[in-house]
């Protein structure tokens, strides 16, 4: 197939999917702007792959995600014996997500984790647990090992007598020692874990949550079969510097279709007024930080957000 024909296929993909995945209008709080990306070097010669690689880059997907999508589009084409520009890849087998050994999976979470509060201190964890927030995470930043151990132990104690599930961000050994419900790691922290460390977390019986920011990271997370997967950042956030642009609602919905075998958590810049659109994608949990931490009355804010989760 000639380059012009491959270009025409790429144009067709962009035409059919630009409304959802292209540069989106940003006139309201539910829209993000996605900038076309350079096309990465091709790794295989098939026309479907080449067209999808071009198209997904033009639709704003970074190189690793454009590559992941192009490979999936090629597998979809081979599996169905047709190249369908209208069908965005969403079958797990086309992303290599099938055939995992259930015995190696981390312990299960409820399919819907509900409102998920990400909180900086054990005191705030306890307050939100007592306010009825069903899932809480201690994101305690410190380089002092003793302070970390003390804060994690205090957080575990703070949720006792409540129904809250407590995840500890990053500090996996302290979480194991204190008997937390689970740990949550970012993608870089997951990559930094040695095999023996990951085995120790698995052997402890703790649940594992993993942050992801696109297709390639979701595939990477699936390799360890975590208890849940977080998807974000959905909207712009000032809390931490992100390596990727905000994902937006259309991408979030596509991620949910692909990863529905996992409990899923949407995170990143989500305010109460955006809960209906987020819930409509099918995620079973919405994580918030500022909406609780910066609220003048955190308990009242929690009650409002819990009501929003119920629709």
Predicted segment positions?
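A general structural signal for short secondary-structure boundary/capping elements
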Residues: 161-164, 213-216, 254-257, 275-277, ...
């Amino acid at each position: 197939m000639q380059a012009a024909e491959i270009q025409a296929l790429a144009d067709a993909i962009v035409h059919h999917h630009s409304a959802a995945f292209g540069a989106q209008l940003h006139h309201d709080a539910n829209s993000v702007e996605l900038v076309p990306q350079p096309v990465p070097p091709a790794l295989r010669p098939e026309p479907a792959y080449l067209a999808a690689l071009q198209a997904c880059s033009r639709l704003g997907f970074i190189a690793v995600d454009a590559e992941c999508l192009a490979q999936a589009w090629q597998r979809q084409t081979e599996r169905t014996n047709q190249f369908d520009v209208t069908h965005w890849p969403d079958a797990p087998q086309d992303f290599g997500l099938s055939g995992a050994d259930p015995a190696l999976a981390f312990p299960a979470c409820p399919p819907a984790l509900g409102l998920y509060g990400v909180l900086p201190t054990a005191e705030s964890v306890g307050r939100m647990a007592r306010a009825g927030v069903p899932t809480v995470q201690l994101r305690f930043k410190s380089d002092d090992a003793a302070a970390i151990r003390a804060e994690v132990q205090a957080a575990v104690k703070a949720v006792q007598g409540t129904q809250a599930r407590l995840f500890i961000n990053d500090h996996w050994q302290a979480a194991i020692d204190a008997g937390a419900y689970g740990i949550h790691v970012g993608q870089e922290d997951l990559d930094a874990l040695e095999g023996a460390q990951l085995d120790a977390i698995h052997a402890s019986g703790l649940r594992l949550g993993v942050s992801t920011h696109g297709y390639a990271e979701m595939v990477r997370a699936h390799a360890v079969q975590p208890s849940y997967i977080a998807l974000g950042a959905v909207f712009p956030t000032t809390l931490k510097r992100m390596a990727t642009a905000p994902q937006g609602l259309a991408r979030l919905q596509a991620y949910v279709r692909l990863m529905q075998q996992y409990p899923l958590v949407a995170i990143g810049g989500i305010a109460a007024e955006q809960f209906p659109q987020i819930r409509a994608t099918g995620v079973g949990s919405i994580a918030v930080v500022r909406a609780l931490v910066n609220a003048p009355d955190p308990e009242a804010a929690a009650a409002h957000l819990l009501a929003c989760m119920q629709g």
